[in-house]
Regions:
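Acidic, surface-exposed loops and disordered segments
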Residues: 1-169
Length: 169
């Protein structure tokens, strides 16, 4: 049996994206509390994601959302990483409030924010190990968050389009 590389790209991209999520899941978490959520988007959901990006871009005047929507459309799949908001009770003040109790609802706990960053770094590192170029997108993450692709109550969502081509979109 001969498998032409072009014929197996999609399956390979999905496999790599799944491995990226494993890396995100197993990345170190603050206080050992895991509130990170991850998923892979492909097929029709990619188009819905791109359309939402365009709508947000038009509504807010963010031209880069329109550019990024085209990148998402050209991708084979998109890995998503976000976090559930949960104050870690350190009273560290890193969020801008003296204690966790004083923190305004909706203001992210910085430990959660750092956890997302570390998970994203682990995910793109895994992609790089397979020779796949990636770029972390705030734009696609915000659209995914608005669509609820990681579930209710998940915020700080970022997206990592996965493409296997001679030139990344």
């Amino acid at each position: 049996m001969v498998y032409d590389e072009r014929d197996i790209r999609k399956a390979q991209a999905l496999d790599i994206a799944q491995k990226m999520l494993v890396a995100a899941r197993t990345a170190p978490k603050g206080k050992g509390v895991d509130v990170v959520e991850c998923a892979v988007v492909d097929s029709d959901d990619l188009e819905a994601l791109a359309c939402t990006m365009e709508a947000v871009g038009e509504e807010r005047g963010f031209a880069f959302f329109l550019r990024d929507a085209n990148c998402v459309r050209k991708s084979l799949c998109v890995a998503l990483v976000g976090t559930r908001e949960k104050a870690q009770g350190l009273n560290c003040g890193h969020c801008g409030f003296a204690t966790c109790g004083e923190r305004t609802p909706g203001v992210p706990c910085e430990v959660n924010s750092v956890d997302v960053g570390i998970a994203l770094g682990a995910a793109v590192s895994r992609a790089q190990a397979f020779g796949v170029d990636t770029r972390i997108m705030f734009s696609a993450g915000l659209a995914a968050q608005q669509l609820g692709l990681l579930g209710e109550g998940v915020g700080q969502v970022y997206a990592i389009p996965v493409s296997i081509s001679s030139k990344s979109p």
